Amino acid sequence: MVSKSLIVLLLVSVLVSTFFTTEAYPASYDDDFDALDDLDGLDLDDLLDSEPADLVLLDMWANMLDSQDFEDFE
């Protein structure tokens, strides 16, 4: 019985912290393309210093931009 209460309490605390944190979701979607602007300033040294996860994100951005489904909302 105690373990069920503990699990429910943990779940509620995670949900509250997720949905009521001011930084959990962006206030507006106007800044969605700032990451694309940041990619313009990359040089070879930046790419060599990147972590593998950063390279995966760059690859995802490139695939999205090459995709036919991507629409520019600006």
From Swiss-Prot:
One of its GO terms (biological process) is defense response to bacterium. GO terms for cellular component: extracellular region. It is found in: Secreted. Keywords: Antibiotic, Antimicrobial, Secreted, Signal. It comes from the Eukaryota. Residues 1-24 form the signal peptide. Transmembrane segments: none annotated. Expressed by the venom gland. Belongs to the non-disulfide-bridged peptide (NDBP) superfamily. Long chain multifunctional peptide (group 2) family. May be an antimicrobial peptide. This is Anionic peptide clone 9.
